[in-house]
Amino acid sequence: MNIEQFQSMLEEKGITLSSRQLEQFEIYFETLVEWNEKMNLTAITEKEEVYLKHFFDSITAAFYYDFSKPFSICDVGAGAGFPSIPLKICFPHLKVTIVDSLQKRINFLNHLAQKLELSDVAFCHDRAETFGKKEGVREAYDIVMARAVARLSVLSELCLPLVKVGGTFIAMKGAAANEEIENGKYALEVLGGDLKEMSTFQLPFEESERNILLIEKKRKTPKKYPRKPGTPNKLPIEK
C-alpha cells in the first residue's frame, strides 16, 4: 500500500487526511524503523507493509465505530502504538492512554509523541492486570482497545475492567474470531460485557481476514477481576 493508496482508501471511508497528518504518518514510519534497529518493535519494516499492516489496519476500527467525539481511550498492550496512535493522528481530539509492560516500548512512545507533537496522550509502564485495579483508571474509559494481543477470554479480563459502564471494548482480531467468541462468551458475561457487533472484512491487497468486535460494557466488573499478573493467561475465564 503506497501513500496515495493509503490516502485514497481512507478518503473512500470518509477519513480525509491533511498534509500535516500525512507528514505525521511519515514521521511515525521513519521513527519506527529507526528505533526498530535498537529494539524489537515490529517484524514489519518495509514501507508499504507498515502503511497497510500497521497504519491502515489500525484505522479500520473507525470504519465500524464513530470516533468523532472526544472519547477517552485506553489501548492495552499497544507495543509500538497500534491501534491508538494511528487513530489519534486521524482524530486529534481523542484522549489516549497506552498501557504496556515493557519500559523500552514506553520510552519509544514518549519519543514518538514528541516527534509527532501529540497532546492528550499518556503512556503507562504497567501490566494490564495491575493497571485495571487502580483507582482513577478502573471503569474510567469510554473505549478500551486491543489489537490481536491474546485470545478473547483473556483479553476481556485485561480490558473490560477499564471500560466505564455504557462504554465500549473494541477487540481487533485476525481470522478464527468465531471460535474465540464461543470460548470467550462466558468471560464477557462474568466481566459485564455484551457482544453488540462483529464486522468481518479483508485487509486490502493481501486479502487476509480481519474481525472487529464491539463489546458494550453493561454492568460493573466484579472487584476480583483482573486477577494477578499471569493468571488470566494461565487460567482463562472459560467454562
Swiss-Prot record:
Subcellular location: Cytoplasm
Major site of localization recorded for this protein: cytoplasm
EC number: 2.1.1.-
Gene Ontology MF terms in the entry: rRNA (guanine-N7-)-methyltransferase activity
One Pfam match: GidB
InterPro entries cross-referenced by the UniProt entry: rRNA_ssu_MeTfrase_G, SAM-dependent_MTases_sf
Any one cellular-component term (Gene Ontology): cytosol
Binding site for S-adenosyl-L-methionine: G77, F82, A128, E129, R147
Disulfide bonds: none
UniProt entry tagged with the keyword Nuclease: no
Keyword annotations: Cytoplasm, Methyltransferase, rRNA processing, S-adenosyl-L-methionine, Transferase
Enzyme class: transferase
Gene3D superfamilies with a match to the protein in the record: Vaccinia Virus protein VP39
Keyword Transcription: no
Family: Belongs to the methyltransferase superfamily. RNA methyltransferase RsmG family.
Function: Specifically methylates the N7 position of guanine in position 535 of 16S rRNA.
Annotated protein name in UniProt: Ribosomal RNA small subunit methyltransferase G
Organism: Bacillus anthracis
